[in-house]
Amino acid sequence: MKILVLNCGSSSVKYKLIDTENDTVMAEGGVEKIGLPDGFLKYKLSDGSKAIRELGLVDHKGAVKAVLDILTDPEVGCIRSYSEIGAVGHRVVHGGEKFSKSVLLTDEVLQQIKDCYGLAPLHNPANVTGIEAVEEILPGVKQVGVFDTAFHQTMPAKSFMYALPYKYYKEDGVRRYGFHGTSHRYVSQRVCEILGVDINKEKIITCHVGNGGSITAVLYGKSVDTSMGLTPVEGLMMGTRVGDVDPGALTYLMKKHNLSADELQKIINKESGVLGVTELSSDMREIEAADKAGDPRAHLALEMYEQRITKYIGAYAAEMGGVDIIVFTGGVGENQTGLRGNVCRPLGFMGVELDEQLNMTTRGTETVISAPSSKVKVVVVPTDEEMMIARDTRDIVSKLK
């Protein structure tokens, strides 16, 4: 079955067309600058090279139409007609407490996603716009929603509750939800395939470290704790997000500088993290280069960033009563060799031992980077959220036939 996977953001639509018969990516690309006069479609050609098609001013419906047109284009397309698309799978950022797994998208489900707008005001409306656009252009084609939050719905209350007055949970849904769930689910399953072990017997810590980052404790195949919270701002220090911070520091700044909630939101989401500390960049490659050139603030940011990851791994190992496997994924986790080494060295007391040579030469490939003598396997696994979405979509739609 050919599955079109869509990730609709506020100003972009990313896509992959995946043939689930053999797990091959037939086409990929994305529309950027939706709603602006210089919108464009970036797509990959069959030889691997990239091309751009100017679109001008388009909305989400126009963006989805542009994606479908490029897929069926007589010269650069890979399918003859829309009818070859068996189903469409959507990344949906927030499913609240309603969704613990991927679901067929119906009017009722769509309304429940809309009910979560307050929890993900930037992402969920864009996700819904994409779903509605597909419904208009491809009526009758089944659509499936795959939620970033779903994998973490197995967390026990002691992990997801905040110690706020209980009424804020009951009335407003304030609790830890966690994100990157599709990635954490994919790499926790994939690492067990690579190692030839049973996920139901393993204690795994998955580290999704990119511009946004989160860590998850996966006990016997289920998420039991994760570093992101009600929003993706909690947890690790990130490219531009603050991560864990004393809430008292935020109320102090609000009062002192007369900040509005929106202004504070912008600071903790867009102006903090690595960018905030270095005042240089949110890109870890640039920060590593600046550190090598002797920039003290870049050095400090790296130390803070790495220490936070180490702390979470240590905490989750304690929570699960040990750890068998540590996984690194995401743009930074897959490629920043120095960071992986610095994160893992303090974990030697837990039996974590890297093969330094293998670690330094592994970038973006599935590789066991721990030494043979290590009590804990450390593995790099490139994430593939789109493949997970495609498989879920295929499984759900196949059962309808």
Predicted regions and their residues:
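N-terminal glycine/serine-rich phosphate-binding loop of ATP-dependent small-molecule kinases
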Residues: 1-96
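Glycine-rich beta-strand-to-loop/alpha-helix junction loops that act as flexible
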Residues: 9, 90-93, 209, 323, ...
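Phosphate/pyrophosphate-binding loops at sites that engage ATP/ADP/AMP, CoA/4′-phosphopantetheine
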Residues: 70-85, 191-198, 313-324
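Short beta-strand-loop/turn "lid" adjacent to the catalytic site in phosphate-handling enzymes
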Residues: 71, 75-123, 144, 150-159
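Glycine-rich phosphate-binding loop of actin/hexokinase-like ATP-binding domains
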Residues: 151-255
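Catalytic phosphate/nucleotide-handling subdomain of diverse soluble enzymes
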Residues: 219, 224-257, 266, 330-361
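Adenine-nucleotide phosphate-binding core of ATP-dependent small-molecule kinases
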Residues: 266, 273-277, 284-319
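Internal helix-turn-beta structural module
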Residues: 299, 303-319, 324-327, 333-401
